[in-house]
Regions:
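Hydrophobic packing residues in well-ordered alpha-helices of helical domains and bundles
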Residues: 2, 32, 102-106, 144-147
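Acidic/histidine-rich alpha-helical segments that form the ligand environment
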Residues: 69-124
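Solvent-exposed, charged/polar functional surfaces in cytosolic regulatory/catalytic domains
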Residues: 8, 12, 112, 116, ...
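Extreme N-terminal tail/first-helix region
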Residues: 1-7
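Short, contiguous alpha-helical
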Residues: 24-72, 118-175
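Generic recognition of short, well-ordered alpha-helical interface segments
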Residues: 4, 41-45, 97, 101-108, ...
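An N-terminal domain-cap segment
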Residues: 7-29
Length: 175
């Protein structure tokens, strides 16, 4: 699931010019590069959180729970949930990061996460929780699902930027 979200995200930003990566559709909207930077920054924090909660689970090991992970979604049928979500300041893009740099950082982080699979599968991750600023308390299973959901949410935002009438390269006069 995370791999699929990463592939969809990477496909949505591939082949863009620097002008397209840095196009801002409105003063209060992020560029494609800023969306990519945000994803890499958030996933860096989520990897640290995963390590922290995994260490807690391994300190008091219980076999994996036989339970369905409660649904958690930031999208409904591919549409963004209503309302604008504001990113905490710590994960707000600072700029100066290209899409390629953000994608490389994100792929490295996800590779580190994938290397934890055996350890994650060996313990019950439903006991360790952490509070999300907008979604409330989530267990580690839900946090892991959120990685892909979050990338998909920003992929949809990127597609919205690309569909803007002012997006560079869409008009024959710009070719």
């Amino acid at each position: 699931m995370i791999e699929n979200a990463q592939a969809r995200f990477a496909a949505s930003v591939s082949g863009l010019s620097e002008m397209q990566e840095n196009f801002r559709p409105a003063p209060d909207r992020w560029t494609i590069a800023e969306n990519a930077e945000h994803i890499a920054t958030v996933n860096s924090g989520l990897l640290r959180l995963t390590f922290k909660l995994l260490k807690q689970a391994e300190a008091d090991p219980k076999p994996p729970a036989d339970l369905a992970v409660p649904p958690i979604t930031m999208t409904e049928d591919g549409e963004l949930k209503p309302g604008k979500w504001s990113a905490p300041e710590a994960v707000t893009p600072q700029g100066g990061v290209t899409v390629a740099e953000a994608l490389a950082k994100n792929q490295s982080l996800l590779n580190d996460l994938f290397n934890l699979r055996e350890r994650l599968a060996a313990v019950d991750l439903s006991v360790q929780t952490w509070k999300h600023p907008a979604l409330g308390t989530l267990d580690l299973y839900q946090w892991l699902v959120l990685i892909g959901e979050h990338q998909d949410r920003h992929r949809i935002q990127i597609e919205t930027v690309k569909s803007s009438a002012e997006f560079p390269g869409l008009h024959p006069s710009e070719e």
